[in-house]
Swiss-Prot record:
It comes from the Eukaryota. Involved in peroxisomal proliferation. Could participate in peroxisomal elongation or fission. May be involved in parceling of peroxisomes into regular quanta. GO terms for cellular component: peroxisomal membrane. Belongs to the peroxin-11 family. The keyword Membrane applies. Its main location: membrane. GO terms for biological process: peroxisome fission; peroxisome organization; signal transduction. This is Peroxisomal membrane protein PMP30A. It is a peripheral membrane protein. Keywords: Membrane, Peroxisome, Peroxisome biogenesis. InterPro entries: PEX11 (IPR008733). It is found in: Peroxisome membrane. PANTHER family: PEROXIN 11, PEROXISOMAL BIOGENESIS FACTOR 11.
Length: 256
């Protein structure tokens, strides 16, 4: 009886559906990978024995290889979105540009991510690919950075739209008030505007969260592009935070 209640508990059901998704498994592996990256830096700084550091690095490399097939052909949805967004001229122009940059960057990023996988497997070598073998990691980081830049543009534009909308709604509410502080007869409009403001505030919080995640990921991409120099402690911590945010997003979207 207790066993049955446990198995069919809504949280367990949701967890099983969550783990059944390749996207959620990839995010969990990403969390472990960046945790290993952070621990490598931490153990090195603490002068912990070299065997422990090498073990953590080995685990990190194994996880990196395991993540790659879960992202195989992930560029295709972005290519589809690229065509869809380009054809939609009704979108806000700034959001449209941001989404085009985002999907262009991610489409090529995941393409080079596959080449990185082949490189890790030893199928892509300097003999059969020439200079690409040495450039593939940097090119992947470059296109990831382009995709993140597009996402940041979209986030900033969405924030501005929401803030402007709230400002207009507040002005409309204030215009309904008389000079003596009493309310005009159109109280229904005021209630509707307040509800819209609450919805806008929810969008603002989500966009701020997404912007924060994209900025942190940009630090990792900038390092991979060799544009900035950051230690593995900073990069590992940034990756841990963004992985947790990604896991939370997938968990919230999973229906029990």
């Amino acid at each position: 009886m207790v066993y049955g209640e446990l198995i069919y508990h809504p949280v367990v059901t949701k967890l099983l559906k969550f783990l059944d998704s390749s996207a959620s498994r990839e995010k969990l592996l990403r969390l472990l990978q960046y945790l290993c990256r952070f621990l490598t830096y931490y153990t090195f700084r603490r002068n912990i024995n070299i065997e422990t550091i090498q073990l953590i690095k080995k685990i990190q490399s194994s996880i990196a290889i395991s993540r790659k097939p879960l992202r195989f052909l992930k560029n295709l949805p972005h290519l589809k979105n690229l065509n869809k967004i380009y054809s939609n001229e009704l979108l806000d122009s700034t959001i449209r540009i941001g989404d085009l940059i985002k999907n262009f960057g991610y489409a090529l990023y995941f393409q080079f991510d596959t080449l990185q996988w082949l490189k890790l497997l030893g199928l892509l070598t300097s003999k059969n690919s020439g200079a690409l073998y040495f450039k593939v990691d940097k090119l992947a980081a470059n296109f990831w950075l382009i995709g993140l830049t597009g996402s940041i543009i979209t986030d900033l534009r969405n924030l501005k739209i929401s803030y402007d909308s709230n400002k207009a709604l507040l002005n409309e509410i204030n215009s309904q008030e008389k000079t003596d502080g009493s309310i005009t007869s159109d109280e229904k409009l005021i209630v509707q505007n307040n509800e819209l403001i609450l919805k806008n505030n929810e969008k603002i919080n989500l966009n701020k969260r997404d912007l924060f995640k994209n900025v942190l990921d940009s630090l990792i991409a900038l390092k991979g592009s060799q544009l900035i120099d950051l230690n593995d402690g900073v990069l590992g911590f940034a990756g841990i935070i963004t992985s947790i945010i990604g896991i939370e997003d997938i968990w919230n979207a999973t229906k029990a």
